[in-house]
Amino acid sequence: MKAHIQDKTKLVNSVFNKVYKKYDFMNDLMSLGVHRSWKKNMIDWMKPQSNQNLLDVASGTGDLAKIFSLKNNNKNEIICVEPNKYMLETGKAKLNSFKNIKWKLAAAEKLPFKNDSFDFYTIGYGIRNVTNIHLCLKEAFRVLKPGGRFMCLEFSKIENEILNGLYKQYSKVIPLIGKYIVGNSAPYDYLVASIEKFYDQKQLANLM
């Protein structure tokens, strides 16, 4: 079990070591920009108040943190947690003007924060990549304040057979796009495989 965890940690880290320079561009290209609408819709639905703080885990380049911050004119206290140092530095540079956003290099399974610290916990397209989802969820609810909200945005299996068939065809193209843009198809082979192997919506909800 320990060897499996170490292997996945190493694999995921190597994936982001390869893609961090083109991460935002590839997200826009692969989703035709739709991922930005999904993120905005989630934050809009949360309706954060200016006195509420946020922990954004597996933050990537900080899209969710930025949208959250702009909802209240950058008055919220926000901490972005990112396990990959290159992704963290990219996100930190991108959001350098947001003085209310702090960055921390840490894993979702071992958060360096006290119990009952945050009003919101967000994780966008990151929970597939954690090495121990049970520990990740345990840590999430540990650091949330009583009544705090856990918000997860993630890819999952498509129940509609026609749409699922179209996605399966498109998923074959994703690694080819990655090879052309990033120079390496392996990270996008991992992306496609991780979505296919991940829990469906009901299974993930049951874990919580």
Task: Give the ranges of each region predicted by the language model.
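Class I SAM-dependent methyltransferase SAM/SAH-binding core
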Residues: 53-110
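N-terminal, positively charged/glycine-rich alpha-helical extensions of SAM-dependent methyltransferases
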Residues: 1-24
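Conserved alpha-helix/loop element of class I SAM-dependent methyltransferases that forms part
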Residues: 32-50, 67
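A short SAM/SAH-binding and catalytic strip from SAM-dependent methyltransferases
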Residues: 119-133
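C-terminal alpha-helical "lid/dimerization" subdomain adjacent to the S-adenosyl-L-methionine
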Residues: 10-11, 81, 153-207
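A generic alpha-to-beta junction signature in SAM-dependent methyltransferases
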Residues: 46-48, 72, 95, 144
